[in-house]
Amino acid sequence: MKHHSRLLLLPLISLGASAAMAAEDPKSGYYGAINAIETRQQAHNMDLSERPGIGSFVAGNEKQNFLNGSLAAGYQYGNGWRTEGEYVFKKSNEYTSGSSTFATSFNHMTTDSQRLMLNVYRDFMLTDKFAVYATAGVGIAKIDVGGWQGNDTRHFADSTQTNFTYSLGAGVSYEVLENLTAYAGYRYVDMGNVESGRNTFVNARGLQDENLRARLTNNEYLIGIRYTL
């Protein structure tokens, strides 16, 4: 997580804490929410992939930007705290890397990722309608990993992993109508390490000793609406 992203969280939390007594907390009750999420995903540490030992690692496309979404349901306790379950929709991406010896034969790592999270929120009411919030979440990410090398007949075996995942974030919210709140925020998500199976093709050394590895993280910018029953 970049330092500037962390610093963005501090003013929001400090502002909310200093004004925590400025307005009443919202009522308690169950709620549902829907989110649109602008995601900037990065595949870190691709140089840790098992390679044939010929040439040096060459970085390729390690970042993807895409729009995703999620659904959530939770409970608002009436004291500034909320908890919810959230499902983040499946999304497919592709990342590349190569070898200095085989300049035109890039490895293509494909990922299909989806998440189920338990999130905790602390709302700091600045007025009766406007609030800032901090959030943290833990959960699992199901990630299918595969890929190919050079051309799509040279496959790496598919692998499915279920990883521990965590998130940290902050944002602002506004009650636009009674029981209906709009919000916008940022969160950092770490989905852990992923890897494909080994190459199903025979490589330059006549062996099946390669795979594709990375650590997946997201910087997510979201807007959403929440309706409280």
Language-model regions, residue ranges each:
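Predominantly the C-terminal beta-signal and adjacent terminal strand-loop region
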Residues: 92, 96, 176-229
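Surface-exposed strand-loop-strand hairpins of Gram-negative outer-membrane beta-barrel proteins
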Residues: 38-69, 157-162
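Short sequence motifs at beta-strands and strand-loop junctions characteristic
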Residues: 26, 61-67, 110-115, 158-165, ...
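Outer-membrane beta-barrel translocator domains and adjoining extracellular loop/strand segments
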Residues: 44-52, 94-103, 144-154, 195-202
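Extracellular loop and loop/strand-boundary signature of outer-membrane beta-barrel proteins
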Residues: 54-60, 101-109, 151-158, 207-213
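Cleavable N-terminal export/targeting peptides
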Residues: 1-28
